[in-house]
Amino acid sequence: MKTKKLIVFLLLAYIPMMIVGFVIHKHAGGIDATSADANAIFAFLFSAGSMLIPLLAVVFTQLIFKEKVFDGCGVSLRFNRWWWIGWLLMPLMALVTFGVSLLMPGETLATDSEAVQQGLAQMGGAGLWGFIALSTFSGMLAGVTVNALFAFGEEVAWRGFLYKEFKGRKFLTAAVIIGVIWGFWHFPLILNGHNYPQHPVLGVFLMVLLCILLTPILMYFRKKSGTLIVPAIMHGTFNAVVGISNILVEPANDLLVGGPGLAGFIVLLLTNIGLLIYDHCCSREDIYLKEL
């Protein structure tokens, strides 16, 4: 990794993100996922659009250093079984996270919440499990389509550009560094109430931990599939289904419940351990333990 190149990329990725955070704070007063008023919609659209910032940072960094824009980033449409394995893993993790969330102190199933009641009313007699199934399936469809497109804007940077630049380093070392860069990149949104509305300052550091735990999983599938598209689909699907716990569990303490909470961290850690064991005992590639 060229230090000067990394600095240029970080400046191009972080400065526009800080501007986005300032604009959201100034014009919308923050991010409120529970509201549907004009300010909340503005904040949502602006924060969603910010996912394209890392893509632009990669493009301009490559142009500044006179290199091909997507050279070595792993953009390939060659399909293999790791595409659907990665896609299906995300809702499985979300459902396990939902179960673990219910085990957190003081958390219970939110069958009486307004969101759940509205969903159940729209589904007729399908019941709670039908609501969960439909929510999960809808999230999977969003994850492999529109969400994947936006996630690609980030993944070009994290699992494309940085993955390429950190080749030669130990897999887990690179994963931690990329996770830290990815996590802190979110700080303007976190301070505005994204993911951790109850604890925005502490949430900045929890988001870094979330990204550190999620990065090895996405990097593993990037390696196994041979394409950046798979982590983009996984990232998009994760974003789409990770909120199921926050809808179905109350009082939904953001430090405990859902993907960004303790429940999610436990599931991510177990998933990493599972992949490490599979990779060592079954595929015998030891990707987690070798260099990129």
Tell where the protein language model's regions lie, with residue ranges:
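Alpha-helical transmembrane segments
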Residues: 6-18, 51, 85-94, 178-181
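Alpha-helical transmembrane segments of multi-pass membrane proteins
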Residues: 13-29, 97-102
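Alpha-helical transmembrane segments in multi-pass membrane proteins
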Residues: 19-65, 75, 81-91, 111-141, ...
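Hydrophobic transmembrane alpha-helices of multi-pass small-molecule transporters
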Residues: 21, 55-59, 187-190, 239-244, ...
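Short, Lys/Arg-enriched, Gly/Pro-containing loop segments at transmembrane-helix junctions
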Residues: 70-74, 110-111, 283-292
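Membrane-interface helix/loop boundary segments of multi-pass membrane proteins
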Residues: 152-181, 223-227
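Central hydrophobic cores of alpha-helical transmembrane segments
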Residues: 174-183, 230-240
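C-terminal membrane module of polytopic membrane proteins
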Residues: 200, 234-292
